[in-house]
Amino acid sequence: MLEAPPLLLVAGGVGLALLALRWLATTDLQFFGRAFIVWNEFIMKPIRNLLMGSSKEQRILQHVLQHAVAGDPQSVVAAIDSYSLEKEWAMHVGEKKGQIVDRVLREQQPSVLLELGAYCGYSAVRMARLLLPGARLLTIEFNPDYAAITQRMVEFAGLQDKVTVVLGASQDIIPQLKKKYDVDTLDMVFLDHWKDRYLPDMLLLEECGLLREGTVLLADNVIYPGAPDFLEYVRGNSRFECSHFSSYLEYSKVVDGLEKVVYKGLSGPARP
């Protein structure tokens, strides 16, 4: 049986992609956002991976190693931004929303910061570069390849003394934070993993006694791809004080935003 050459498969894939985009790309912003993600993550990414023999995440790391300055976190952030803007779209928080993250972090000055979802380490490096002496960041990543790239990124930035990369599912690691990682309570949590895990993981943090009065949770992508159950819960519950920062999906014109949630303490049942 004859096998189709890779380029023929690619051409066929692109043809199917264009047909899919004709259906997805309407005037509805949600459909436009969906088309943007489908094109970049489910069409172009596997095509490039096939042709180049490496993953997008590996290419991002190589770009950083070649163009950033070792021990300079800001140059690492800038290199990732330039690659994701000019070469291949990637799901980092990005420069526009990153400035919001910077501002919140500077205001809070956390001693213990938890990140849910490391991906390639962009936000870990971005946040850790602003931490005060003695402060630390734990970042939980489920994908072992992403966790390894994050670890390499953190080490290249010279932040290995501030950042601990934890491999595993958030729902498995969160109950271990107190005993295994010596966490009493968290000053700040950055949520940027699976959007359907935002609400259950926040409630799990509360159940495990990791939230204190004044703990700040900053959730990315609450508009697109969206975390409607999370927003509905925190905005309708007296245990939380919410504020919204409107912005755009990383490296795009798709409307997005971050939600800042301040935990006011347990004044009612922890489950919706």
Swiss-Prot record:
Presence of the UniProt keyword RNA-binding in the record: no
Sequence ranges on the Cytoplasmic membrane side: 1-6
UniProt KW keywords: Catecholamine metabolism, Cell membrane, Cytoplasm, Lipid metabolism, Magnesium, Membrane, Metal-binding, Methyltransferase, Neurotransmitter degradation, Phosphoprotein, S-adenosyl-L-methionine, Signal-anchor, Transferase, Transmembrane, Transmembrane helix
Residues that hold Mg(2+) according to the record: 192, 220-221
Gene3D superfamilies in the record: Vaccinia Virus protein VP39
Annotated function: Catalyzes the O-methylation, and thereby the inactivation, of catecholamine neurotransmitters and catechol hormones. Also shortens the biological half-lives of certain neuroactive drugs, like L-DOPA, alpha-methyl DOPA and isoproterenol.
PANTHER family xref list: CATECHOL O-METHYLTRANSFERASE, CATECHOL O-METHYLTRANSFERASE 1-RELATED
Protein name per the record: Catechol O-methyltransferase
Organism for this UniProt entry: Bos taurus
Gene coding for it: COMT
